[in-house]
């Protein structure tokens, strides 16, 4: 009887532990997803020239996040219009001078970009130097990046082919988001198994059946993180999954790094690169694996930046354009927050924050909010003004002295539609170049 009781207690303890871990993972997923405030949407998918022109990404629906995308024609059907539409999305246009990925001040407009598989060299050449600069600015400014197969190759310094260092290619056109070589696996039209190390950050989000294995992941000419003969693994690279594969004379990838992450510094986004193709699967562990990579990438978004300190009685003019290269005073973009700090003195009877637009550009909706001790958002404070228009006044009666934060939010946004090339915008497209405003605080 005692033995039966002991076994029952042991089983109950194991079940409790499993439930606790499942809850912990669910909380980790929810925490990452809760930090989307101040971004236009979570995901932008690149299916541009040379890449798979995918119109759906199952993991976005699985996670419940919003996505927009660009999808070109197939390589054999490409035309000048594909280049025009791709440049409009990534490089900019009259109504959006720095492209969809970036706000007017250079902050990331999406939390993450996902780059599909396909032909990395063709895509890199099609986007050119300007497109590469936009992608680099996006990641450096805090936007995260996930690339599979070609999307992993193109994010590296160069690709390393079978001939060793003599086969080093594309160093002049790749995006250099990760300072290492993506080495060809030489494996085509096959399946691989991925093994997650015990310390893999992806295990924060799912347990993958408890064995840390993801089976039957499609692989077609993908890559691994080169570590050794020609260049050591870049400092800061985190192995997230390894290949499990019965090596042959031609293909020797067992135990090699199949998925890896990299974050250059505290202000940059996180880059996650995967040599295989889990992205099209709509169920099971491969879907969870793709979702985990997305979550880990988005977890690398840095904390929002403070634009500056508002001083008593001074009017701060936020009217610069992208071309002025002065982000601390640049206009606000659609669904973006601008954060400011104020120092309320002792014995202050009230603090009045005022917001207004500029003549000829007041037909936008800006809102205002404030909070003591932490950044203000619509959902964490009752001190807010959300009426139509730009002009606002927010009075804080008998405020406690100390550090407060004031935030401006641009309610006006574009109307997003889907067509032949993926997303296109209608409606208030002028908001993409930013809304100018003036903000001040006065103490009594």
Model-identified regions with their sequence ranges:
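Extracellular ligand-binding/catalytic regions of CAZymes and related secreted enzymes
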Residues: 28-40, 47, 54, 136, ...
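Surface-exposed intrinsically disordered loops and tails
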Residues: 74-105, 161-169, 210-231, 307-328, ...
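Noncatalytic accessory or regulatory domains flanking protease catalytic cores in secreted, cell-surface
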Residues: 366-433
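Acidic, Ser/Thr/Pro-rich low-complexity intrinsically disordered segments
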Residues: 329-379, 399-403, 443
């Amino acid at each position: 009887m005692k033995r039966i009781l002991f076994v029952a207690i042991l089983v109950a303890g194991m079940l409790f532990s499993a439930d606790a871990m499942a809850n912990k993972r669910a909380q980790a997923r929810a925490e990452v997803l809760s930090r989307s405030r101040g971004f236009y949407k979570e995901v932008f998918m690149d299916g541009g020239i040379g890449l798979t022109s995918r119109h759906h990404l199952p993991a976005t629906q699985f996670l419940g996040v919003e996505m927009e995308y660009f999808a070109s024609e197939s390589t054999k059907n490409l035309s000048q219009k594909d280049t025009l539409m791709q440049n409009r999305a990534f490089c900019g246009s009259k109504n959006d001078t720095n492209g969809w990925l970036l706000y007017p001040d250079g902050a990331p407009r999406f939390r993450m970009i996902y780059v599909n598989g396909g032909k990395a060299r063709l895509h890199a050449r099609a986007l050119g130097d300007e497109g590469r600069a936009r992608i680099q600015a996006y990641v450096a400014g805090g936007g995260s990046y996930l690339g599979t197969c070609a999307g992993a190759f193109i994010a590296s310094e160069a690709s390393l082919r079978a001939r060793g260092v003599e086969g080093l290619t594309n160093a002049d056109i790749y995006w250099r988001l990760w300072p290492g070589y993506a080495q060809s696996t030489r494996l085509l039209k096959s399946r691989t198994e991925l093994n997650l190390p015990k310390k893999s950050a992806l295990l924060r989000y799912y347990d993958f059946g408890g064995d840390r294995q993801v089976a039957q992941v499609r692989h077609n000419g993908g890559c691994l993180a080169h570590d050794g003969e020609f260049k050591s693994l870049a400092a800061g690279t985190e192995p997230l999954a390894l290949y499990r594969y019965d090596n042959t004379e031609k293909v020797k990838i067992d135990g090699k790094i199949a998925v890896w992450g990299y974050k250059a510094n505290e202000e940059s986004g996180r880059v996650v690169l995967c040599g295989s193709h889990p992205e099209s699967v709509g169920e099971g562990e491969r879907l969870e694996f793709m979702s985990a990579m997305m979550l880990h990438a988005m977890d690398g978004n840095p904390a929002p930046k403070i634009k500056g300190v508002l001083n008593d009685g001074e009017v701060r003019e936020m009217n610069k354009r992208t071309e002025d290269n002065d982000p601390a005073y640049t206009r606000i973009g659609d669904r973006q927050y601008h954060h400011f700090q104020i120092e309320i003195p002792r014995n202050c009877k009230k603090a009045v924050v005022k917001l207004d637009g500029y003549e000829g550009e007041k037909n936008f909706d800006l809102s205002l909010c404030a909070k003591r001790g932490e950044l203000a958002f619509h959902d964490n404070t009752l001190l807010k003004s959300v009426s139509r228009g730009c002009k606002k006044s927010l009075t804080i009666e008998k405020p406690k002295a100390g550090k407060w934060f004031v935030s401006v939010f641009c309610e006006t946004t574009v109307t997003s539609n889907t067509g032949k090339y993926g997303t296109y915008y209608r409606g208030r497209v002028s908001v993409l170049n930013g809304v100018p405003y003036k903000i001040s605080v006065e103490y009594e």
